[in-house]
Amino acid sequence: MKKLWTDLHSNIHHNQMDELDKWVEHAKAVLDFWPIAYYPFQMIKTESGAGLEDLCPAEEIEKDWELVREKVKEVNAEGYPMFMGYEWQGCGFDGDHNVFFLDNDQPMKHPMRYEELKKEYENTEAIAIPHHVAYQLKSRGKNWATHDEEFSPFAEIFSSHGCSENDTGMMDMERHLHMGPRTGETCYERGLEAGLRVGCIASGDNHKVPAVYDHGSMCVLAENNSKEAIWEAMKARRVYGVSRSRMDIDFTVDGKPMGSVVPAGKHELKFSVKAADAIDRVEILKNNILDEMAVHSGTWETRKIGDEEVIRVKFAAEFGWGPNPRFYKDMLVREWDGSLTVPGRLVSIEKAWNSYGQKLYDVTENSCKFHMTTYMSTANGQ
């Protein structure tokens, strides 16, 4: 199977629709496929003066949705697998979900409850993927009691909001304080404890630039890169997520791929992991508890490299002046042109991009050229 990468959570707003082409071109440069998630909400002021997020006017939403439809059809005709989608929040009682469609013919619906949303798209190839699930119940955290495995085959548990796997892990959810801290009541582990078969991914929840490297991304194990094959893989939960750099992960139980259902009992588990940096360990959880651990640290650090031995080396190149705005206050944008040549062979190049204005070109077996743009403040907050 092919490993195809995407950002499943790129929210383009009404006031950004004139940038739609820019969003699409950036996504095509870094992603194997792209489900766009139109964001039909705006901030309004209540009578008390407090800010409140509500739906945009219906005519604006409808106009934008047709622009998205037209663009997706155009990109599909060019051979790139792009999906139509939008964010649904309802009344907040069931959690936020991104709704995606296999075809490009569906309307956008805004019912108040998750079960109503599911009914709206009965007999339609549609999925609704919950995100930042660990916020408070009835305050945009996930309501696992209403969850449907077929309609929502997996959940987004890491993004720019932080990590929703549980409420005790090292990756917190303190970036958006107005949405509250994460809770154990609604986190991903509660869904598993309820017996739900739900996969997990990471994706950005990006509102300025799609596919922000530092906000996570999703991998799909598909037969090929057609929309139909990708859709089948997502429905079958052959998905995983990474919080930053991409990882090549293979995982089977009795030869069945991730996302499969096997009966309880004794089984053979096999996995293979290739990462962008040294792997410390692989943890195997059972019933949300650490059951086994494969420790890699200490198995390679002291091994001597032979004089004639050929090795693979991976390194990161970073440009800019750092996240501190006290320095070079007037230099909002900086452009960099460079090249890289190695004595051996370039095995692969990962585009670790957080903003627009990046280009990789003239890539050969042992060299490449690049144009990078750095900003005083990027989409990842740095």
Where do the model's predicted regions map?
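Extended, charged catalytic domains and RNA/DNA-binding interfaces, predominantly
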Residues: 1-382
